[in-house]
């Protein structure tokens, strides 16, 4: 717990120190983020991950062992199937 406190204090000092030298908060925050991290790059990364995930087949979710009615015409109870 004590270590977490000091890490938090040091982070606050690291962020606010440039402000005491006349820097603007917006510039300080931008300095903490790498230049190649942009909204466009983040969205491209997410889209490329979705393409790889498309290989995974769709598995319908069943809540409390009852599947949605659109899968089987009426409620399909997994407990009855196991008997």
UniProtKB/Swiss-Prot annotation:
**Which positions correspond to the propeptide?**
23-55, 71-83
Give the location in the cell.
Secreted
* Secreted is among the record's keywords: yes
Q: Which residues carry this modification: D-tryptophan?
A: 64
Output a single Gene Ontology CC term carried by this record. extracellular region
The tissues in which it is expressed are:
Expressed by the venom duct.
Leader sequence residues: 1-22
4-hydroxyproline modification sites? 68
Q: Which GO terms describe its molecular function?
A: toxin activity
Disulphide bridges, residue numbers = 62-67
Q: Which UniProt keywords apply?
A: D-amino acid, Disulfide bond, G-protein coupled receptor impairing toxin, Hydroxylation, Secreted, Signal, Toxin
Spell out the family assignment given in the record's similarity comment.
Belongs to the conotoxin C superfamily. Consomatin family.
Q: What does this protein do?
A: Moderately activates human somatostatin receptors (SSTR) with a preferential activation of SSTR1 and SSTR4. In vivo, does not cause behavioral changes in mice within a few minutes of intracranial injection, but causes a progressive loss of movement thereafter. Four to five hours after injection, mice recover, even with the highest dose tested. Shows antinociception and antihyperalgesia activities in two mouse models of acute pain, most probably by acting outside the central nervous system.
Mention any additional remark: This peptide is an evolutionarily optimized stable analog of somatostatin. In addition, it adopts nearly identical conformations as in the somatostatin drug analog Octreotide. As this drug, it contains a D-Trp at the same position, whose synthesis is a common strategy used for enhancing the metabolic stability of compounds in drug design.
Anything noted about its domains?
A: The cysteine framework is C-C.
Annotated protein name in UniProt: Consomatin Rs1
Q: What is the scientific name of the source organism? A: Conus raulsilvai (Sea snail)
